[in-house]
Amino acid sequence: MTYGTRYPTLAFHTGGIGESDDGMPPQPFETFCYDSALLQAKIENFNIVPYTSVLPKELFGNIVPVDQCVKSFKHGAVLEVIMAGRGAATVDGTHAIATGVGICWGQDKNGELIGGWAAEYVEFFPTWINDEIAESHAKMWLKKSLQHELDLRSIVKHSEFQYFHNYINIKKKYGFSLTALGFLNFENADPVTIK
């Protein structure tokens, strides 16, 4: 049987942070801190595969908080994600990390939903921050990026932008912050036939 390309129909948003005084070179924050961030995000038992940032229209209205679907997670499964995640070491002058994912939806000239796009945001801070700073910076930069996605394609905004963010004030040697969309259910487009 021939299948067309696969696209997600259900997604969830999540986020997590991690920090540690231990790690392995060359990027010590990529080991223990990243694992802790995945655990807090409740996606630690998936094999993570990153996506770029195009969303099918079937996801509109079908992006839920992670807690609504975590009981259905399958240990060892592949989880395709759009993720903004980075780590840092305080010795390099970073004392806080903010991350975020934003979503925009576009419409055609008749006002019909076409689909959407996501944007990722990561920012390093030399001092500790609070949630208000993390949220305002995430929205500022994601709004700019999402509008660029629409303008690049000459597409009109269909609905309000959506934003998800996270941050960490690093109290140990290393820290990691992530914000992600994970994709769970899928359908297939019609197969392509060449005549």
Swiss-Prot record:
Subcellular location: Cytoplasm
Keyword hit for Lyase: yes
Gene Ontology biological process: arginine catabolic process
Annotated cofactor note: Binds 1 pyruvoyl group covalently per subunit.
Sites marked Cleavage (non-hydrolytic): T52, S53
GO cellular component: cytoplasm
Reaction(s) this enzyme catalyzes, per UniProt: L-arginine + H(+) = agmatine + CO2
One Pfam assignment: PvlArgDC
Required cofactor names: pyruvate
Alphabetical keyword list: Cytoplasm, Decarboxylase, Lyase, Pyruvate, Virulence
E.C. designation(s): 4.1.1.19
Subunit structure: Trimer of an alpha-beta dimer.
Role, per record: Part of the AaxABC system, catalyzes the decarboxylation of L-arginine. The arginine uptake by the bacterium in the macrophage may be a virulence factor against the host innate immune response.
Protein's name in the database: Pyruvoyl-dependent arginine decarboxylase AaxB
Gene coding for it: aaxB
